[in-house]
Amino acid sequence: MADAKTIKIEQIGSPIRRHHSQRETLIGLKLNKIGRVTELPDTPAVRGMITKVHHLVRIVDEK
């Protein structure tokens, strides 16, 4: 797993007035404030979560 790919994402939008499931998805991505950056493994599950809230996050870096 030394070669495991990671992805950095940044929250750029607020979850205010968004559906509850989108808020929960942001929490699952370890994001809770605008401007926060988190690094997660690049898996299909994480990619799916990013797709669900693509309007609230941006990909900063892919390794």
UniProtKB/Swiss-Prot annotation:
Native source organism of the sequence: Bradyrhizobium sp. (strain BTAi1 / ATCC BAA-1182)
Subunit details: Part of the 50S ribosomal subunit.
Assigned keywords, A-Z: Ribonucleoprotein, Ribosomal protein
UniProt GO MF annotations: structural constituent of ribosome
Gene coding for it: rpmD
Name of the protein: Large ribosomal subunit protein uL30
NCBIfam families according to UniProt: rpmD_bact
Similarity comment text for this entry: Belongs to the universal ribosomal protein uL30 family.
Gene3D superfamilies cross-referenced by the UniProt entry: Ribosomal protein L30, ferredoxin-like fold domain
Pfam family, one: Ribosomal_L30
Domain of life: Bacteria
Keyword Isomerase annotated: no
One GO cellular component, as annotated: cytosolic large ribosomal subunit
